[in-house]
Design a protein with these regions (language model features):
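Bacterial N-terminal signal peptides that target proteins for export
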Residues: 3-15
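Bacterial N-terminal signal peptides
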Residues: 13-24
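Sec/Tat signal peptide C-region and signal peptidase I cleavage site
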Residues: 26-30
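Catalytic-core signature of thiol
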Residues: 31-409
Length: 409
């Protein structure tokens, strides 16, 4: 009896040990699989966003050879941004032609309504003034006393002047809403050189990292510069909040790390405003909107320099820079653009059309001697010429989608 019990106990113990070994083996395999998956994902991500050493070398050799062959005006270097594929460090997605036409139709309708309303108010005001003039003239005519007539005329003249001043003040306020730079401070477009990139007229160059958020950085950079120009106050806006929260007027996301469009940013800032970097620091990846509360940093008005969002003429671009400050725009980035160090970027790469662009940038000035725009990029101050690049007029579709904004006070 005792021997039979021992036999059963041994059998049970054996089964239990086998079960433990099986579970342990499964756990080890699971752990091993997880690590392998992580390593595999890392390699895939690295392959997706980066160039291999051989690819970098080959790309640089090709760029240098092309520069020498075509005798270009700019120099290049092996910088940090050359390590990444272009698609991972750009990311602008222009609206379709249908979308632009729809937006333009909406804008025209609103402008026509506003025009008719303003004209109606103007006619009513003229009618009121004419009736007032006739009434006072009748009163004056009834007065027999010459001194009284003179006094009444003097009072009438003073009232007229006050009314004129009031109308002029109203016009000045309306004009301020239609421009960001006061007319007496705006640079002349006849200047051969001008740029909003001084210590008192521009904010620091930011770095978007390996995230296609150039559209968000451009939206923030344009607002920061123009707010500084208008109010004399330096801002550091949150690109992360723009990345996570911005939607256009139709409720569509302005973009993500896979690309976007700054038009949606300005739509959002018209309604909600913008948060500061301190409130929502940049993480370099798309997240969840942490706050939708309205802020004081709003856009009063914005629009494209050309109604069809096409590439403006140099004169049109200068006028916008003079009137509004920094301008949001786009360009086609190539390996040569990535490797830019100094000089005037005059690649004139092959393009399929005016909207063949992939990167949002900020245009802050011009130089007619260089025949180029001064562009503020979002790849950090160590890239290019301290974060800036001179791009020759017309090169690589520079200026497509150029847009201006008027910021709050």
């Amino acid at each position: 009896m005792k021997k039979r019990v021992n036999t059963k106990f041994k059998a049970f113990t054996g089964i239990f040990l086998i079960l433990i070994l099986t579970l342990t083996s499964s756990a080890v395999n699971a752990q091993k699989t997880t690590r392998e998956d992580i390593l595999k994902k890392f390699k895939q991500d690295k392959q997706r966003i980066g160039r291999t050493d051989d690819e970098i070398k080959e790309t640089m050799n090709s760029v240098v050879a092309d520069l020498k062959k075509k005798n270009k005006k700019f120099t290049v270097e092996l910088n940090e941004m050359m390590k990444y594929k272009i698609s991972e460090i750009t990311g602008t997605k222009p609206p379709s032609e249908d979308e632009l036409r729809r937006l333009e139709d909406e804008k025209r309708k609103k402008e026509e309504i506003a025009r008719k309303k303003a004209e109606k108010q103007r006619q009513e005001e003229l009618k009121r003034l004419e009736e007032e003039r006739k009434r006072r003239e009748a009163e004056i005519n009834k007065e027999a006393d010459r001194k009284k007539q003179e006094e009444m005329r003097r009072q009438e003249e003073e009232r007229r002047k006050q009314e004129e001043r009031r109308r002029n003040d109203d016009l000045n306020r309306a004009e301020m809403n239609d421009r960001n730079i006061p007319a007496d401070l705006a640079p002349s477009i006849t200047l051969p050189f001008f740029a909003w990139n001084g210590a008192k007229t521009s904010t620091i160059v930011q770095h978007q990292g390996v995230c296609g958020s150039c559209w968000a950085f451009t939206g923030a950079a344009v607002y920061e510069t123009n707010y500084l120009l208008k109010n004399g106050e330096t801002l550091d806006l949150s690109e992360q909040a723009i990345l996570d929260c911005a939607v256009d007027k139709n409720g569509k996301d302005a973009g993500s790390c896979d690309g976007g469009w700054y038009g949606g940013v300005f739509d959002y800032m018209t309604v909600k405003g913008a948060r500061t970097e301190k409130e929502d620091p940049y993480k370099g990846k798309t997240g969840f909107c942490s706050s939708s509360a309205k802020t004081k940093y709003t856009v009063i008005k914005w629009g494209y320099i050309r109604r069809d969002a096409g590439i403006p003429s140099v004169k049109e671009m200068k006028e916008a820079i003079s009137k509004y400050g920094a301008i949001a725009a786009t360009v086609k980035v190539t390996p040569a653009f990535q490797a830019y160090k100094s000089g005037v970027f005059d690649e004139f790469a092959s393009v399929s059309g005016a909207n063949d662009v992939n990167h949002a940038i900020t245009i802050v000035g011009w130089d007619d001697n260089k025949k180029a725009y001064l562009v503020k990029n979002s790849w950090g101050p160590n890239w290019g010429d301290k974060g800036y690049i001179w791009v020759e007029y017309g090169s690589n579709n520079i200026g497509y989608g150029a847009a201006w904004i008027v910021v709050s006070q």
